[in-house]
Amino acid sequence: MSHYRAVKGTRDIFPDEVAAWQYVESVIHRVASFYAFHEIRTPVFEYTDLFQRSIGATTDIVGKEMFTFQPDPNGRSITLRPEMTAGVMRAFLQGNRASESPVHKLYYISNLFRKERPQAGRQRQFCQFGAELLGASSPAAVAEVIAMMMHVFRLLGLKGLKLRINTLGSIEDRKRYRDALREYLLPFSGELDAASLERLEKNPLRILDSKNPAVQSIVSGAPSLRDYLQPAAVEEFEEVLGYLDDRGIEYVQDPLLVRGLDYYCHTAFEVQCSDLGAQDALGGGGRYDGLARELGAGADLPAVGFAVGMERLMIALERQGLLSTIPPKGPDVYVVLQDRAFLVHAVALCGALRDAAISTEIDLAGRSMKAQMREANRIKAAYALFVGPDEVASGVYGLKNLESSSQESRSLEAVIAELGHG
């Protein structure tokens, strides 16, 4: 056994587990196509100042969690992406995609990196799927993005979900409320935990989503963000809720819900799953119209999106017994050799079957027929195709259905006609 180990906070995903991931990813791709979203892939690292500018210098992500390095002593600092929205927006602006169409609907399934304390569903290298609707952030657009996210969960059969939703108002509304909240919390400085004290100066809104019961008790008496919203923001939020009602999407209004990234405004939402325990957030998102301006676009760009943690999603699906319903996919045919003398003939058979789009496996380790049959059953092959002296001479092969154990004789052409997909 090697003394090398995976880096702390990372994990290997072997083929038996990858099959479940591929199934979930296929559902995501399918739902994205229902809503006419198109996949985008961006570099795994970006210049550090992109995240400092977009996520916010006062956030925990920028302050504590980014993997940053400087490949050239005289060059710019580079960071492994801790989230996708900033990179997608950078790509959109750099590629001048707005000149092609006013609205772009993009989605991704991508690996991200953060220096977090590893725990179940929270790794230092992790995967998210998400969507960004750029060029529109109307109530209908917000509802469309939420509907797409919930559609994925529905097709996967996930239960025990709670969609929490709130409005953060405009940037100006948030600034007024931030000042009022800080003024309310200052007298409680001696009762706040270290994390909340740090947020009190940098971004007091983050204190609202503290999981510390003592802090939650203090926050329960805080002024409400709703009291600082302009009427237009309230009206817009109610319109979003109306669209969700029309689609039959259940939600809970939560005035304490805030998002951890500074670029959010107006509608914010989060999905919780009861099977994830204390850390029950599955994903979330919201509007971020001001991000394009922050990145130098010169003007706001309407935008709304979400992100869902894939590891957390897989844990929730497993705990609800939904991954066991995914049928294991083995090869269509396992070619079983009676004698190694017929290996050349068997390899040619494999080639013909594969050319006909029939997935085919063959023993390359020189095992006995009994061991080959055990392997065929272990990898859940659908059929065994037997190759021996009689089969080679006649061109007719024994084809055994490994589920029913029935066996018939078939020529290669008949096997291809029966099992071929091409």
From Swiss-Prot:
Its main location: cytoplasm. GO terms for cellular component: cytoplasm. Keywords: Aminoacyl-tRNA synthetase, ATP-binding, Cytoplasm, Ligase, Nucleotide-binding, Protein biosynthesis. InterPro entries: aa-tRNA-synth_II, aa-tRNA-synth_II/BPL/LPL, Anticodon-bd, Anticodon-bd_dom_sf, His-tRNA-ligase, HisRS-like_core, HisRS/HisZ, HisRS_anticodon. GO terms for biological process: histidyl-tRNA aminoacylation. Its EC number is 6.1.1.21. Pfam families: HGTP_anticodon, tRNA-synt_His. It is found in: Cytoplasm. One of its GO terms (molecular function) is ATP binding. It catalyses: tRNA(His) + L-histidine + ATP = L-histidyl-tRNA(His) + AMP + diphosphate + H(+). NCBIfam families: hisS. Homodimer. Belongs to the class-II aminoacyl-tRNA synthetase family. This is Histidine--tRNA ligase.
